[in-house]
Amino acid sequence: MSILALPELLPPTHTVPKCASMDLLNGSAYTWEQRKLGEVADIVGGGTPSTSNDDYWDGDIDWYAPAEIADQIYVASSERKITQQGYDNSSAKMLPVGTVLFTSRAGIGKTAILRKEGCTNQGFQSIVPHINELDSYFIFSRSEEMKRYGETVGAGSTFVEVSGKQMANMELMMPTTMEEQVTIGSFFSNLDSLITLHQRKSKIGKMPLK
């Protein structure tokens, strides 16, 4: 969602954060700078344990596949789980809380924020924010921008895929301070909560009366 469109979407009691309205809406870049994603985050791929070894599966380690990333903002439990043995014998990497999962194939650009550490298959190039350099919800709020970038630069003989190196080279305009990032991230978090609440009320209102 473009920040330029936000004032028209918000209720009267909600306003665009000052740092966003002052700098983006008025075209000033005083408190913003251009950074490469790889400068403020690690881009981490995934892997899959052998599916023919039962000892690798049905453990207690969350292991995500692109198909289970949809419209949710946060994820805390995967559909399939792997064992420590399966993890040790694959290229999967443990991702900390706050990681933004980013699907890199089979539909580039689906995102979700980890609420519990876990790992993924090779269909992801996940974004692990550097402490005090990148706010999880701030970068999550740039999902559409990252999706467009991934679809543009991705290449593959069978299907489009974006690599970790390509994601790390993505250039973003971002606040120079974490305080501004957190302010914007919190704003979008509250906005998403309002939208979710409105959608729930809308569904309830459309339910047939018995």
What are these regions (language model features)?
Residues 1-13, 27-28, 126-135, 167-182:
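Proline-centric
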Residues 3, 39, 182-194, 198:
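Extracellular/lumenal glycan-associated surfaces
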Residues 6, 18-21, 208-210:
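Hydrophobic topology marker
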Residues 11-12, 30, 195-209:
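Extended intrinsically disordered, low-complexity coil regions enriched in Ser, Thr, Gly, Ala
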Residues 15, 24-47:
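Non-catalytic DNA-recognition/assembly elements of restriction-modification systems
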Residues 17, 33, 135, 159, ...:
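Hydrophobic (often cysteine-bearing) scaffold residues that line and stabilize catalytic clefts
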Residues 38-174:
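DNA target-recognition domains and sequence-specific DNA-contacting regions of bacterial/archaeal
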Residues 155, 176-178, 193:
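Loop/turn elements at beta-strand to alpha-helix junctions within RNA-recognition modules
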